[in-house]
């Protein structure tokens, strides 16, 4: 099996090393793991692409590349340049340092990489490690992802719930904020929304009097709807959410059509 991996934390991020281990085991003997990851931190860039400027790419080693662009840029670089058009069997993005459940999924560069893979017609999975108090003193904060990642990916590949008409399906996997031994299981889940979940900006003045705005997030350990990815993660479960890039609110179409008549 040929696997392309990327992330949004950057080429030197420890989560990418974990993902490379997961990918190598999935690929198996004789398989190939190709890495194309951002040269610099790209957290929060979502599904953006470098449309108005070129992306510089550098080879760091065998099948290992860093690109000065977003995760979506990296996926395209892998598909159309690095892998010479020889398509991968699977695209993996992560393992993100921090959760991408709930509203975080909308901002995530990790999901942006997986989404681009799906839009390009490939099987794609995003993997993220929820952080919590257990991680602060852990020798390996990615313990849950490292120990359970291979099994989850294999289950998704075996389920064959891919493709379909229109936008392709990709998967958002979030490992709970516990060590591997504390994981209760794996559950399918819808995307949740934390109560009062809003990003905001706070202003600070530099010594020279210049005004800077810093993005601030909201509390992450806030429960969402029962059974959602957020609530399941906080309860110790790995969540798996099937996703598509289609943003249409289908439940509003009929009423909108009537209002526009």
Swiss-Prot record:
Its EC number is 3.1.3.5. InterPro entries: SurE, SurE-like_Pase/nucleotidase, SurE-like_sf. NCBIfam families: PRK00346.1-4, PRK13931.1, surE. The keyword Nucleotide-binding applies. Nucleotidase that shows phosphatase activity on nucleoside 5'-monophosphates. Coiled coil: none annotated. Transmembrane segments: none annotated. Keywords: Cytoplasm, Hydrolase, Metal-binding, Nucleotide-binding. It catalyses: a ribonucleoside 5'-phosphate + H2O = a ribonucleoside + phosphate. Pfam families: SurE (PF01975). GO terms for molecular function: 3'-nucleotidase activity; 5'-nucleotidase activity; exopolyphosphatase activity; metal ion binding; nucleotide binding. It comes from Dinoroseobacter shibae (strain DSM 16493 / NCIMB 14021 / DFL 12). A divalent metal cation binds at residues 8-9, 43, 96. It is an enzyme of class 3 (hydrolase). This is 5'-nucleotidase SurE. The keyword Cytoplasm applies. Belongs to the SurE nucleotidase family. Its cofactor is a divalent metal cation. The gene is surE. Its main location: cytoplasm.
């Amino acid at each position: 099996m040929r696997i392309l991996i990327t992330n949004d934390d950057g080429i030197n991020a420890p989560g990418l090393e974990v993902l490379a281990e997961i990918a190598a085991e999935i690929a198996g003997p004789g398989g190939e793991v190709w890495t194309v990851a951002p040269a610099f931190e790209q957290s929060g860039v979502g599904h953006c692409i470098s449309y108005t400027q070129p992306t510089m790419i550098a080879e760091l080693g065998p099948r290992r590349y860093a690109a000065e662009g977003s995760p979506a840029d990296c996926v395209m670089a892998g598909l159309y340049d690095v892998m010479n058009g020889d398509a991968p069997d699977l695209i993996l993005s992560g393992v993100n340092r921090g959760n991408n459940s709930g509203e975080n999924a909308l901002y995530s560069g990790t999901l942006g990489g997986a989404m681009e893979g799906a839009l390009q017609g490939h099987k794609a999975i995003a993997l993220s490690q929820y952080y919590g108090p257990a991680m602060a003193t852990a020798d390996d904060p990615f313990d849950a992802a490292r120990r359970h990642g291979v099994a989850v990916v294999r289950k998704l590949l075996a389920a064959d719930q891919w493709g379909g008409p229109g936008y392709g399906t990709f998967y958002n996997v979030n490992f709970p904020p516990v060590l591997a031994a504390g994981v209760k299981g794996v559950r399918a889940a819808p995307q949740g929304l934390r109560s009062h979940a809003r990003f905001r900006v706070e202003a600070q003045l530099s010594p020279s009097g210049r005004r800077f705005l810093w993005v601030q997030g909201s509390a992450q350990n806030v429960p969402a709807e029962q059974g959602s990815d957020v609530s399941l993660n906080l309860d110790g479960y790995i969540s798996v959410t099937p996703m598509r890039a289609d943003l249409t609110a289908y439940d509003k179409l009929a009423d909108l059509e009537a209002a526009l008549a």
